[in-house]
Design a protein with these regions (language model features):
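Conserved short loop/turn motifs at secondary-structure junctions
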Residues: 69, 234-237
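Aromatic- and glycine-enriched pocket-lining scaffold segments that form the walls
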Residues: 238-244
Length: 473
């Protein structure tokens, strides 16, 4: 329990910390937009490309996500402008002019002080979950070669993210964009399930007897949960943005931050959902497609993905969507049916087992993305040294580093690290299969029940190893 240490407890409860980090990140985000739209068309000399898709992406996938779960959401700048407008305040909690309380437990906003343009509507039930985030991610991923190599396109995509967040903040309650729409938030939430950090209540019984529910409704110390989470029922990381509001507002001192065994949330059976399982399949499929497009030797595939011709891109899009939405899920559906027989779970619907076993793919998927990110960062991070002095590519030399030459870093170590990551992900996924099967009453645990999934996971890992150690070498 990290809140045991007074110094860390004080830091985590500081409202200014969150505001400062978000404001600094917002400055970088706006600079990336301006550089992308107005700066040089050379991606390796443009701040918008280098610092978003290399530096930020490397930090997210290599450090923040595997170690901190939704830690990026704590400082993400995208919701900041909309939230400030929604609250009519930059830092102050409701007792000093905020607008987030009083609220109702059902989530609707009852405040009379809300700025009239911020309607505070509830998000439609039919659109809840992460299906929209799955679709948004697929859209960004499909055009990723264009977005990551053309600064102006990247800049306008970032503008769309910001405009979407502000627009939804003016119409819907709290961080609706983050919870249900953000294309990045979907996979961050999914992979946060394996993170070794969690925010939880200490004793749910205390919450049962506490009628005011300050953690959700807000009080003079802070806002109600921006993520629409009810901490007293929360037992998984997927929808908690680690904003820390409940740490400030809980009058019973019953909310804390813990270190825990990685992957604990994967076994929370009532949290198993088809949209999240599909996200696991989508992320694994894209983790195979990205190294083929960005790192592989297939020039024709790069040309297709880069929109060199409409017919080529059409063929690429068809294959991309088929792999993500049909082929990979279909293979795992077949494996789930075999597992149902092998584990003696014939009374369990195949659909239920298919969804549950989808979560066992999360460790391997995260490892695959870390492996891809490693190649991307090691090969390109040195561009950041020159770009920081000349963010627009206009010949500036702000810090005297403009002329530092590009050179790849640690590339001789990359294959070994990638292999270790993928093998560790494979082992973790197989162990998770066994743990998930044990949650079903009557399952014949052991080698027989695990074999179908283990065979599929091993084949997928071998293919990924070939991509990194063979085809891309």
């Amino acid at each position: 329990e990290l809140m045991r240490w007074p110094w860390l407890r004080s830091i985590l409860r500081q409202r200014a910390l969150n505001w400062v980090l978000m404001t600094v990140a917002l400055g970088g985000f706006l600079l990336a937009i301006v550089a992308g739209i107005l700066g040089t068309a050379a991606g390796n000399a443009n701040f918008g490309i280098v610092f978003v898709w290399i530096v930020w992406w490397g930090l997210l996938m290599g450090v923040l996500l595997p170690l901190g779960g939704r830690l990026w959401c704590f400082l993400c700048p995208i919701p900041a402008p909309g939230e400030w407008l929604q609250r009519k305040a930059l830092v102050d909690p409701p007792g000093n002019g905020g607008v987030t309380g009083p609220l109702s437990i059902d989530g609707s906003d009852r405040s009379e002080s809300r700025w009239r343009l911020a309607r505070g509507w509830r998000w439609p039930k039919a659109l809840r979950g992460i299906w929209l985030q799955n679709g948004g991610f697929l859209g960004v991923a499909l055009f990723s070669m264009v977005i990551l190599t053309r600064p102006s396109v990247s800049g306008w995509v970032l503008v769309a993210f910001l405009a979407g967040a502000v627009g939804l903040a003016m119409l819907f309650e709290r961080r609706t964009f983050c919870r249900y729409v953000c294309p990045v938030g979907g996979f961050i939430g999914l992979y946060s399930l394996v993170a070794p950090v969690e925010l939880r209540v200490r004793d749910p019984l205390i919450c049962q007897d506490h009628r005011t529910k300050d953690c959700y409704l807000g009080n003079e110390a802070g806002y109600g949960c921006p993520w629409l989470e009810q901490p007293w029922t929360m037992d998984r990381n997927a929808s908690c943005g680690l904003c820390g509001e409940c740490l400030r507002t809980c009058t019973k001192d019953n909310v804390t931050v813990n270190l825990r065994l990685p992957g604990s949330d994967l076994l929370v059976a009532h949290g198993w959902k088809l949209d999240e399982a599909y996200k696991a399949f989508i992320m694994l499929a894209c983790a195979a497609i990205y190294p083929m497009v960005f790192l592989g030797p297939w020039g024709w595939l790069k040309a297709w993905a880069n929109l060199d011709s409409l017919s080529g891109f059409g063929a690429y899009a068809l294959g991309f969507l088929a792999l993500n939405l049909v082929i990979v899920p279909g293979v795992h559906l077949g494996a789930a049916a075999l597992t149902r027989w092998a584990a003696g779970l014939c009374a369990v619907p195949v659909r239920r087992l298919f969804i549950a076993l989808g979560y066992s793919l999360i460790p391997l998927g995260l490892a695959a993305w870390m492996a891809f990110t490693l190649s991307l960062v090691f090969a390109n991070l040195s561009y950041a040294i020159s770009v920081v002095s000349d963010p627009f590519g206009w010949g500036w030399n702000l810090f005297g580093t403009r002329d530092v030459a590009w050179h790849p870093w640690l590339m001789t170590w990359a294959p070994s690290i990638q292999a270790a990551l993928l093998i560790a992900g494979l082992i973790a996924s197989i162990v998770t299969v066994d743990a998930i099967l044990r949650t079903f009453h009557g399952s014949r645990t052991g080698i027989r029940g695990v074999v179908p999934q283990a065979v599929i996971f091993t084949a997928e890992t071998i293919f990924l190893l070939w991509l990194y150690l063979g085809a891309s070498a």
